[in-house]
Amino acid sequence: LPPNLVECFYDITNADRKEWFCTSDPKDRKLGSGGGTAWLLKECIENDSDNQQADWQQNLPSWLAAEKRILLHAGGQSRRLPSYAPSGKVLTPIPIFRWGRGQKLTQNLLSLQLPLYNRIMQKAPSSLHTLIASGDVYIRASKPLQEIPEADVVCYGLWVDPELAKNHGVFVSRRDNPERLDFMLQKPSVAELGKLMRDYLFLMDIGIWLLSDRAVELLVKHSVKADGSIGFYDMYTDFGKALGDHPSIIDEELNSLSVAILPLPGGEFHHYGTSREMISSTLAVQNSVIDQREIMHLKVKPHPSIFVQNTKVEYKLTPDNQEVWIENSHVGSKWQLHSKNIITGVPENDWELNIADGVCIDVVPIGESDFVARPYGFNDMFRGDITDDN
């Protein structure tokens, strides 16, 4: 998790400390998804251990074998989704689905992710104890899960067009053996995928990986440096590209791991990585069921891409207000909103504001009575030189 969320996570979510453990990456170095996995395992093993001086790597095999666990990577800085950077994207509040039953007004990205991950773990063979997933996606499976084969690594993917696959990791399998990984690519070009389609099938990586204890131990081994510290190691480019029948990275130990690739039945992939994706993904989820007999929420919004949660809005929204997200805020009658506006955390006010297209406002409480306003642009990336206007 982000460092500021670790200590208050249990209070915010009412999570049981016996069921949940959270930590953040060290502040002095970047670890990547592989190194971050090793760090999370190390921190959790040491937290569980009565002997803090014990070697966590020696305890790793027995600890892994003890029970099944879900590892969720949600520690990003959320630079492209500033509205939920303080709490982490994984706690982004998600509007109830107009077609959904059993929804909660307090639901967030984390609570929506877990049911699928739990179903997968219940279905997984007894040899697979570890599931690793990303914290900034919502993945749905509208159909029952297939049987999960015995393998050191089992990865789920989606059938997608090359145009979408080019932005993600891709599992490539031979047409005569579609469940067996031949090799993995990272962000391949459309032309590259086009050349493969005669003899190969490809699935987009959706970030759900099941690992055997042996696979986890090798992932950790490659993440730990000679001095015993954990360094940068990427699970997808470094570890993933060493998997399959014809891997691009030659490593005898990793090359020997057996790998199975499964298409997620009725799968949907919704990314919550940016401000735009937060709205577009939520809209896509709302529209995943269009049968009016299944839709229980009968109110028609001025525009489908308007989302209002836990908010007092005295300003009249219109069809011109497109890609608008208002949460935990007071928007008074003297406000004027346009499009691509994200308003979060605004306290009760009597302000007269004209929020231009693409302007977003987040307000963070400081101490008992103070607030800090954080204006930003809808498409701001918050990267590069601080003096750069972009």
Model regions: which residues?
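Left-handed beta-helix
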Residues: 1, 22, 29-58, 153-154, ...
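N-terminal glycine-rich phosphate-binding loop and ensuing alpha1 helix
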Residues: 1-129, 133, 138-146, 386
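Short, functional N-terminal and low-complexity linear motifs
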Residues: 6-10, 76, 182-187, 246-250
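Short, conserved catalytic or adaptor-binding loops enriched in Gly and charged residues
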Residues: 10-16, 172-175, 243, 248-256
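Conserved core of the sugar-phosphate nucleotidyltransferase
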Residues: 64-66, 85-88, 94-227
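Conserved catalytic-core segments centered on acid/base and nucleophilic motifs
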Residues: 71-72, 81, 184, 209-212, ...
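Alpha-helical architecture
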Residues: 74, 134, 210, 271-272
